[in-house]
Amino acid sequence: GKIVTLIGSNGAGKSTTLKTIAGLVKPKSGSITFNGEPLLGKSTDQIVSRGVTLVPEGRRVFAQLSVLDNLKLGAFTRKDKEEIEETLLRVYKRFPRLEERKNQMAGTLSGGEQQMLAMGRALMSHPKIILMDEPSMGLSPIFVSEIFDIIREVSEGGTTVLLVEQNAKKALSIADRGYVLETGN
């Protein structure tokens, strides 16, 4: 997979672009296709089923659910139980802290651990492309480096990453391509 980063000033439309691709925002005009199939008019679960998943800004974990339950929610569109278990094992291998804390409530995790959980939950859907919105926001420098290493690993594993990130230097250092959004119009 490739890593493509969108950079630009606040209000340029980076997050809106990701939300629109994910089906959370309806565009005023234009079209969105993925692997030759139109995404406009599809429900979010249909979009996830086609291999597109979003790791939202601010992580958005389900605080009152366990780490394991959060991860299982990422596979809600999948029906292949054995494959889901194999994916869960791969997620635990990539994020050992999540396995150690699988019965812990997600709301009690640190910011970096919550980001790992959000990324792991996205990987549970077995995506072809992950839309990542500000994954390093609010994290300590050690977690930022770890998150960017994981993004690179995900890409090397064959999944494309569309990355929105304020840390332009770090994002461009791992990106195969970078695009600048100038205005929000």
What is each PLM-predicted segment?
Residues 1-185:
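Glycine-rich phosphate-binding loops of nucleotide-dependent enzymes
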